[in-house]
Amino acid sequence: MGHYFINLFTYTIIAFIFSAVLCKFLMKKMINYKFGYDLHKKEKIKVPEMGGLAVLFSNALFIPFVNPIFVLPIITAGIIGIVDDIAKLSPKEKLILLFISGLIIGILFYNNSYVNLIEILIIALGIMISSNLTNMLAGFNGLEIGMGVIASISLALVLFLDNYTTGFLSALIFSASYLGLLIFNKYPAKVFPGDVGTLPIGAFLAVLAVVYKEYIPFLVIMMPYVIDASLKYLSAGVMSRDEHKPTTLKEDGKLYYIGGYLSLPRLILKYKPMREPHLVTVLWIIGIFFGIVGILISLIA
């Protein structure tokens, strides 16, 4: 048991440090190659993008020490994210690529006796849907990465309580890698994650949920994403991420909702305008709440 906790501590700490150091390096390189502008600031701030590359490399390097097959959804979703960041895939193209990659991953997991035939399709659908959900709840400094860390830690604790050691350790390394990115992505953001950073979150968590049959806790943990996507769909139909216009920043430094499509952040701002870091904190608290509920459901079950 002592040896297990030493490995646990070692892998997670090194993954965190590696991700943070690599992210710092990439920020300097990407600022002149791939960058965007922070839309919720009074000044026009130039911010490097694709910081998720640091997390992709960190997870690809350290998760195989636990179980190599668990890195597959991260790498495939990450590659699709890179293509999307550079070439701007349409929503339909992104869904198709994620579904096809999900089928391939499902077959590989089936060949290694992790899932049955029906679960191959569940993995494909899970990767397609979940990756898009974690990609859509975004647009504010630290939001998507912070929510991803909360969701992955929540699922890690569910797996720990159910004695799934390999899944728990994989999810913990995954969380540590994203924490390394969050240091630079939190308000005020010094780097944006890009789709290479957001798509793998949903893909990895969906695969863990299917492999370890943690369907209900996973669905509960993902509820903030589901609510956000439902609000967007009901208010505006299917949109590409580029169509997600920023909220209004007024002279008092607060963000306001003044019409247009609804989302979870906009629903909050509709009733109480607030500053960007405060809004993100509220959303993190919502994520933590559903994470705790998911953990409690696992304990009861």
UniProtKB/Swiss-Prot annotation:
Does the record carry Transmembrane as a key word? yes
> What are the recorded GO MF terms, alphabetically?
glycosyltransferase activity; phosphotransferase activity, for other substituted phosphate groups
Keyword Transmembrane assigned to the entry: answer is yes
Q: Where in the cell is it found?
A: Cell membrane
- Signal peptide boundaries: none
- Transmembrane regions listed in the UniProt entry: 2-22, 62-82, 95-115, 117-137, 140-160, 164-184, 191-211, 280-300
Q: Which InterPro entries match?
A: Glycosyl_transferase_4 (IPR000715)
User: Its GO biological process terms?
Assistant: cell wall macromolecule biosynthetic process; cell wall organization
Where is this protein primarily located? membrane
Q: What is its EC number?
A: 2.-.-.-
- What is any one of the record's Gene Ontology cellular component terms? plasma membrane
Record key words, sorted: Cell membrane, Glycosyltransferase, Membrane, Transferase, Transmembrane, Transmembrane helix
> What is the protein name for this chain?
Putative glycosyltransferase MJ1113
Q: Which organism is it from?
A: Methanocaldococcus jannaschii (strain ATCC 43067 / DSM 2661 / JAL-1 / JCM 10045 / NBRC 100440)
What does the organism's lineage look like at the top? Archaea, Methanobacteriati, Methanobacteriota, Methanomada group, Methanococci
